[in-house]
């Protein structure tokens, strides 16, 4: 049911140093994007059809990981089945949904997320 990774979220202690490493050393492209929920503009590191969204450990973006410490991350899978199907699967396995369904800005455009 999972076909690929869309993006991961990296919590960084020093955004400038993190951006420098990923862009200057690894050749990724810095990209700014505005989340569909109207929250402030954010930064991401784009490579191929994926991206790494950056969260500043000093000013965590909501929603964020339960314990957003520097070096922690979360990830977003792309699926060939609907969000509604995933809600059913999670309910069957008694897995609570922390956020969603909600529209997010994925690596290649808008997507629905839970």
For the regions a protein language model found, what residue spans apply to each?
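Short secondary-structure boundary/capping segments
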Residues: 43-44, 64-67, 105
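Core segments of cupin and vicinal oxygen chelate
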Residues: 11-58
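A generic structural signal for short beta-strands and their flanking turns/coil linkers
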Residues: 6, 26, 41, 48-50, ...
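Vicinal oxygen chelate
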Residues: 87-114
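Helix-adjacent hinge/juxtasegments
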Residues: 55, 62-79
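N-terminal beta-strand motif that seeds the catalytic metal site of vicinal oxygen chelate
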Residues: 1-16, 73-75
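Short, conserved charged micro-motifs
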Residues: 17, 82-87
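Short beta-strand micro-motifs in enzyme catalytic cores
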Residues: 41-43, 73, 109-114
């Amino acid at each position: 049911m999972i076909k690929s990774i869309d993006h991961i979220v990296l919590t960084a202690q020093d955004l400038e140093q993190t951006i420098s490493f990923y862009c200057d050393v690894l050749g990724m492209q810095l990209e700014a994007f505005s989340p569909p929920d109207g929250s402030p503009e954010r930064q991401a590191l784009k490579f191929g059809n994926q991206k790494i969204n950056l969260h500043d450990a000093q000013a965590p973006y909501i929603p964020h990981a339960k314990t957003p410490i520097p070096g922690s991350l979360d990830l977003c899978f792309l699926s060939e089945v609907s969000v509604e199907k995933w809600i059913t699967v999670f309910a069957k396995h008694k897995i609570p949904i922390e956020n969603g369904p909600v529209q997010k800005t994925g690596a290649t455009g808008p997507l629905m997320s839970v």
